[in-house]
Amino acid sequence: MSPGFRRAVTGQGAAAAVQLLVTLSFLSSLVKTQVTGVLDDCLCDIDSIDKFNTYKIFPKIKKLQERDYFRYYKVNLKRPCPFWAEDGHCSIKDCHVEPCPESKIPVGIKAGRSNKYSQAANSTKELDDCEQANKLGAINSTLSNESKEAFIDWARYDDSQDHFCELDDERSPAAQYVDLLLNPERYTGYKGSSAWRVWNSIYEENCFKPRSVYRPLNPLAPSRGEDDGESFYTWLEGLCLEKRVFYKLISGLHASINLHLCANYLLEETWGKPSWGPNIKEFRRRFDPVETKGEGPRRLKNLYFLYLIELRALSKVAPYFERSIVDLYTGNVEDDADTKTLLLSIFQDTKSFPMHFDEKSMFAGDKKGAKSLKEEFRLHFKNISRIMDCVGCDKCRLWGKLQTQGLGTALKILFSEKEIQNLPENSPSKGFQLTRQEIVALLNAFGRLSTSIRELQNFKALLQHRR
């Protein structure tokens, strides 16, 4: 430090210098040390995930999300909160979800569950809005009677399965089709006590945690003086692998959602036209190791852990989609083939990843205890999916429901290995099935994680540019 600089940093200048040093310290810790290295509870390093996602997964999953089979999602945003009296929905205009009018939805999508791979439709590759949806292809009427009977069996099986999340009844009058591309996940202004109540309920009541242990930075917890959260992590490390994994999945999902909000933040609005983009200040508020007392980097590591879990699920479910009987049907033969080819290409990439999480390490104890723990795990997660109906912002609720359903589908896949291995090639299996709703949620949820990791790289670059 030069003599001139020493003289300058007095009084208010000293405060400014300290702030500058804090910023540089954040950059250094984030880029070089805090979010690097090997993840806990697995043998994968963050740098390998970054490269794999950037060069193999992200470009393809982004294209897949733009395919019409994966862009339409039927969801009930009017289900009442089952846990407390919700004090109304968010009135902020950016919270609003614009559904596709029923009359605009292609016939192929409205066909319902009688043909589970024919519930999306498109014949145009560039669809600007729902107004053009009626141009899409209709259902292929050349299905054999045998296939139609098989589809009925599939629907029966779907209704009887034990899911890891609460599924919306697509036949409910309150369920609506939403074009995900027209309703992107981004910062809406939804915050405060309502948002905190949702996440507090998730963490405090559904993460195998006693009430006497408080997670760090919980604004609803009683004051703990100088406690920086180490007591929480001491407790967490003392848990079995399965319960640690559960917490990391929820924390990773929370981190991913926060990254989306920071990356697509309402920066300004002029002449009624909003401008969205990355907000570095908001990113620092949520992830800066200084501002979050070390929590930010832990959250980001949990994001990578969640990415590994869903990546593993995609690699395990590949045989299900590789069968000739599975066709992501839209009514346009050429487009159908392209969509499936792209999906299978993504599956091939997921199988090539060399450092997968080993799900066999979970629920590996005595059979009775493992079965009981697995059921508790499933019910806790299913409860979290129900909490998403308590989110006051419609757009936040939409993406919260989709991403919890996607993770729930991933967990269902990971714990159905034997059923997937025994799938028949040319006929439906009663041992394992996925609904179209689950397929759309699974791939879009993983796409959100892939985007989160890509956005994290963008924030690192922005911060480095500011040095």
UniProtKB/Swiss-Prot annotation:
GO process terms (BP)? cell redox homeostasis; endoplasmic reticulum to Golgi vesicle-mediated transport; extracellular matrix organization; glucose homeostasis; insulin processing; protein folding in endoplasmic reticulum; protein maturation
**E.C. number(s) listed in UniProt:** 1.8.4.-
Q: Do you know which SUPFAM superfamilies this protein is assigned to?
A: ERO1-like (SSF110019)
What the entry lists under InterPro entries is as follows: Ero1, ERO1-like_sf
Q: Which residues are glycosylated?
A: 122, 140, 145, 383
EC category = oxidoreductase
At the top level of its lineage, which domain of life is listed?
A: Eukaryota
**Subcellular localization(s) per the UniProt record:** Endoplasmic reticulum membrane
User: In its keyword annotation, does this UniProt entry include Electron transport?
Assistant: yes
A GO molecular function annotation here is:
disulfide oxidoreductase activity
- Post-translational modifications: N-glycosylated.
Membrane topology per the entry is: Peripheral membrane protein
Task: Kindly indicate whether the keyword Coiled coil belongs to this entry.
Answer: no
User: Which terms in the GO cellular component ontology are assigned?
Assistant: endoplasmic reticulum lumen; endoplasmic reticulum membrane; membrane
Entry cofactors: FAD
Activation/inhibition comment: Glutathione may be required to regulate its activity in the endoplasmic reticulum.
Query: Keyword set for this entry?
Result: Disulfide bond, Electron transport, Endoplasmic reticulum, FAD, Flavoprotein, Glycoprotein, Membrane, Oxidoreductase, Redox-active center, Signal, Transport
Q: Any idea what job this protein has?
A: Oxidoreductase involved in disulfide bond formation in the endoplasmic reticulum. Efficiently reoxidizes P4HB/PDI, the enzyme catalyzing protein disulfide formation, in order to allow P4HB to sustain additional rounds of disulfide formation. Other protein disulfide isomerase family members can also be reoxidized, but at lower rates compared to P4HB, including PDIA2, PDIA3, PDIA4, PDIA6 and NXNDC12. Following P4HB reoxidation, passes its electrons to molecular oxygen via FAD, leading to the production of reactive oxygen species (ROS) in the cell.
- What is the name attached to this protein's record? ERO1-like protein beta
